[in-house]
Structure formats: C-alpha cells, structure tokens
C-alpha cells in the first residue's frame, strides 16, 4: 500500500512539473507587466526617464491641447497640426511621438470657499455631482535603442535624447502651448493609472486582468481596444483634413476630426493613443520605389492604381519636402462590467464611417495592444500589422487637438454653464483676466424678456464691486 501511495505522489508531482513547463503559471502572465519597465529615474530638471525592458527610454510631457472645443476656428486646427509636424521633424529618425488623450467621466465638484453668499452657494450645490467629461493630454518622447543580444550605453545617443527633450518643449512654448515634464512620482502614478484605467478617483487600486478576443476583464469593469486602421484593408478617405464639419441649426461648424472619441456611450474612461514612428527616409523612399516597380511589372487595374498612388506620394515628397512616417492609432474604451460592448462599438463604427474611416474589426490581440500602449513601450507594436505608412501631414490630422471649455483665470468671474451643463467662469469684460482680450470696458446687455439680463447685470455689478475693478 505504501508503494502505491509513493508512486501516486510521484506521478502527481511529475504531472504538475510537466504542466507548469508546458502551460506556464500565473507568474508568467504577471511578467507581462513586471517587465514593462526596468526603472524610472529622474534626470536634471526633475525629468523622469522611463527605461523599458527593450532598452528604449522615454520622457512624458503633460500639455493642454490648444484648440477650444466648438471654437469654430479652422486655422487653429491647422496650426496645431503644423506644430506637431515640426516636433516630429525635430525628433528625427529613431524616435517616436506617443500622444495620449485621456477622457474621464466625472461628477462636478464646486470650489470650496467660506466667503460665498447664500445664492452663490445654492447655485453651485445645484450642479453638484453633474456628470461631465474631462480631458488630459500627455506626450511621450521615445528613443528606440538598437535591439541586440546586449544593450550598451551610448553617451552620444543619450546626450541627443536630452537635447531633443529641451527642443520639443521650446517648440511647444513658441506655439503658445504650456507644457511640463513629469517627475518620477508623477510618471509612476500616471503609468499606474493607465494600468488601472482609473483617472477620476484620487485613490485607486489595481486588479486582475482576464484577456479575451474582444475585450479585457478588470474586476467590476472591462475594456476594449479599437484599432483605427486595419493594415490588411485600410479604410481611410483619399483626402483628410484636421477637422470635419457638423451641422448646427442649418449652419456648418468645424470640429475636430476625432471629436467622436469624447461621445462614446457607457464609457467611464477612454484613452486615445496616437503613435508616430519616424523611420529612415532614404530607406523608405527606396522601398517605395521598389514596390512601385514591382506593381508596374504586373499590369492590371489594381496594380496600375497602386503605381499612380505611389507616384503621387513621391511627387509630394519631392516638391513639398514632406516626411514619411509610420502610424498607429487606437482607443482604449473602459466601461462597467455589465455594459453591452456592442453599443459603444456600433457608435464608433457609425461615427467614423461618416467621415470615411473604417475602424478595424480584427483586434484579437487585445492584451498585446493594451500593454504596448503604455508610455514608452510603443516600439513593441508589431511592425507587420500594427503600423501603417503614411505622410506626416495626414497622420497629424488624426491627432486629437481640442480641450474642453475651462474657467478663465480672472478675478472677475461670472459663471455660466458650458455645453456639458457645468459652470465655467467667464470674464465678460475681457480685460481683467490673465489673458487680455481688450482694454475697453464699455458693454451693454441685450436679450429678450426672461433671458436673465437682470441676473447677469447683478452678478457683474457684485463681482466688480468685490474685486475693486474699474
């Protein structure tokens, strides 16, 4: 009997060893996240540098998109697109620009103050908890390290990386965009929040992941990654602009081309990843020429169309000195666990179809896309089916360029609700705020009966008296 027990235990142990060696264990899955970064170190100027397991290093820049939502300023969209093109040109070969726009549904919380009057306090209490969408924008500058068996420290490349970081910040400052590099503590928290997909709460925790073909489970929530372009059947319009027109009261108004990502039903958090890879231009032009010759050698309608398209791209590059870049765009949509993911899927497909973009329906590598969308880890994206070649100007049109309406920095604040229904402070004089719009204080209030003229004038008079404005 003892011999049988010993043989049974031995067979059980051998089976467990074979099972672990073949199928792995939970620790093997955990390494997917543990080995994302070797470390996060702080350099001069309190700039955090993230070192990935592949040897790439990166820094995260927090900015504010310059275009105000519903501003109807077409030039502003083009100016920001051109500014990002300048950043890409400055970075050059071997770098990647990873822009992340984080959209979070929050409940409105009024500013705490002990000096408010009863009516003002009641006004803000009325809007307390009203849901609205907040947008935060981060840009990660990534330098690729040549992959090999051993990664060696290159002082020249490291120095070039630090110089490029300063140049990018200067370019943004010249374009009127305030920016700040995250320090070690801020970068660590940002990476953790990306992993937890939680940006609304001050305190958060990480949970387990359950990856499937169409979504990833995260405890009481789940998320789905939508890739904007399917490289096997690219569905993009022939002509793309940084904005699109919508109809409002029988009049057209320009909005951001990617404005649909802010209106996904049921989503609590959305991260729009926009990645631009900068390749060797000569190498890519030679590959294009080779591809054109290959298509020309087999004359049929589809090949002739391909030859014409390549010729047009070559002409644009030669005449206008444009750049070839590789792009990847995806949206991480996080919803409560009981949400039917077909609803946001249908909304995105319908919205993008209206502007001529057919999003990919074959994103089966959900966990791979999620992990490779972490800041600094973008070079792990598969070169064959996660990146597509295009001109830099076209890629910049797919960037998100807007920010939500914010309260003006002014001592003279008159509150009105924005299009989301939450209060924002407006300086109606245009001369008291940090941003001066005029030096003329003369104005009049015009409106039909019951539109709030008396309330507006009372608010203006009271604020003017409180702040001693003239």
Task: Annotate each PLM feature.
Residues 73-77, 81-89, 101, 410-470:
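Glycine-rich phosphate-binding loop of nucleotide-binding enzymes
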Residues 3-401:
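Extended, folded cores of ATP/NTP-driven motor/assembly subunits in large transport
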């Amino acid at each position: 009997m003892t011999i049988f027990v010993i043989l049974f235990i031995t067979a059980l142990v051998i089976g467990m060893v074979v099972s672990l060696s073949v199928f792995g264990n939970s620790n093997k899955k955990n390494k997917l996240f543990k080995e994302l970064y070797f470390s996060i170190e702080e350099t001069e100027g309190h700039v955090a540098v993230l070192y990935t397991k592949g040897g790439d290093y990166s820094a995260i820049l927090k900015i504010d998109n310059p275009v105000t939502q519903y501003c109807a300023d077409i030039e502003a969209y083009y100016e920001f697109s051109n500014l990002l093109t300048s950043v890409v040109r400055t970075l050059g070969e071997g770098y990647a620009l990873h822009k992340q726009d984080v959209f979070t549904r929050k409940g409105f919380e009024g500013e705490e103050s002990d000096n408010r009057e009863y009516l003002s306090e009641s006004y803000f209490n009325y809007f307390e908890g009203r849901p609205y969408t907040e947008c935060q924008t981060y840009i990660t500058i990534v330098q690729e390290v040549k992959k090999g068996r051993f990664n060696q420290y290159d002082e020249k490349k490291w120095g070039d990386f630090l110089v490029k970081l300063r140049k990018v910040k200067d370019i943004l400052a010249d374009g009127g965009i305030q920016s700040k590099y995250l320090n070690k503590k801020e970068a660590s928290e940002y990476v953790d929040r990306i992993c937890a997909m939680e940006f609304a709460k001050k305190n958060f925790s990480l949970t387990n992941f359950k990856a499937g073909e169409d979504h990833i489970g995260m405890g009481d929530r789940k998320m789905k990654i939508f890739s904007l372009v399917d490289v096997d059947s690219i569905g993009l319009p022939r002509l793309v602009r940084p904005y699109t027109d919508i109809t409002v009261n029988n009049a057209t108004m320009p909005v951001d081309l990617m404005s649909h990502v802010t209106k996904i039903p049921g989503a609590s958090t959305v991260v729009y990843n926009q990645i631009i890879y900068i390749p060797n231009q000569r190498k890519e032009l030679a590959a294009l020429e080779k591809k054109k010759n290959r298509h020309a050698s087999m004359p049929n309608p589809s090949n002739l169309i391909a030859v014409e398209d390549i010729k047009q791209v070559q002409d644009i590059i030669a005449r206008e000195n444009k750049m070839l870049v590789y792009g990847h765009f995806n949206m991480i949509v996080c919803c409560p666990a009981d949400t039917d993911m077909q609803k946001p899927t249908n909304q995105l497909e319908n919205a993008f179809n209206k502007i001529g973009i057919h999003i990919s329906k074959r994103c089966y590598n959900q966990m791979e896309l999620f992990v490779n969308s972490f800041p600094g880890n973008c070079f792990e994206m598969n070169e064959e089916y996660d990146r597509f070649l295009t001109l830099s100007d076209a890629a910049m049109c797919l960037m998100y360029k807007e920010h939500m309406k914010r309260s003006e920095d002014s001592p003279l604040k008159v509150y009105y609700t924005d299009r989301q229904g939450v209060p924002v402070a407006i300086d109606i004089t245009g001369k008291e705020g940090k941003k001066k719009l005029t030096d003329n204080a003369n104005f009049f209030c015009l409106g039909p009966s019951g539109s709030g003229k008396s309330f507006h004038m009372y608010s203006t008079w009271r604020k003017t008296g409180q702040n001693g404005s003239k």
